[in-house]
Amino acid sequence: MNDSEEIFISRSELDTLELGRKFAKTLTPGVTVLLYGDLGTGKTVFVRGVGEAMKVAGVRSPSFTLVNEYESPTGVFLIHSDLYRLDEGGVEALGLEEFIGASDSVLFVEWPERWRNIPVDNVIKIFFTALSETEREIKIQEE
């Protein structure tokens, strides 16, 4: 991937969903998407939009399940993980490494700061910042 950065302003949850839908069209299996941002800034909403574009229903926050796997009709898996409640040892026990670069999945990780062995190849970083109660800045960095 080429290094690039795009900044979007979302004014509502619907805007964030739509941005996720559009972003999904740019994804290829094997990519890891790292989602940075405080609680409530739209990370899971964005992934739900990706899921909708992939024809995956019922994308929910993995805050308590830690990892959710969804299979699209095309056979590509959407893997969605939330590391918020884990320390480094707990993250390693999840086995996320098996999804890195996998030819049949895209991996989304919320709170990647908690992941010591964070991947560096084929990674997209997305930063969510609350500008107001409803407005979000969403910065997408491809490396």
Question: Which ranges hold each PLM region?
Answer:
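Conserved lysine of the Walker
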Residues: 43
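N-terminal pre-Walker A segment at the start of P-loop NTPase domains
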Residues: 2-22
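Short phosphate-coordinating micro-motif centered on Lys-Gly-acidic
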Residues: 6, 89-143
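Short beta-strand-centered segment that lines the nucleotide-binding/catalytic pocket of NTP-utilizing
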Residues: 56-70
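P-loop (Walker A) phosphate-binding loop of NTP-binding proteins
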Residues: 38
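Phosphate-binding P-loop
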Residues: 24-30
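Hydrophobic anchor at the beta1->P-loop junction of P-loop NTPases
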Residues: 33-35
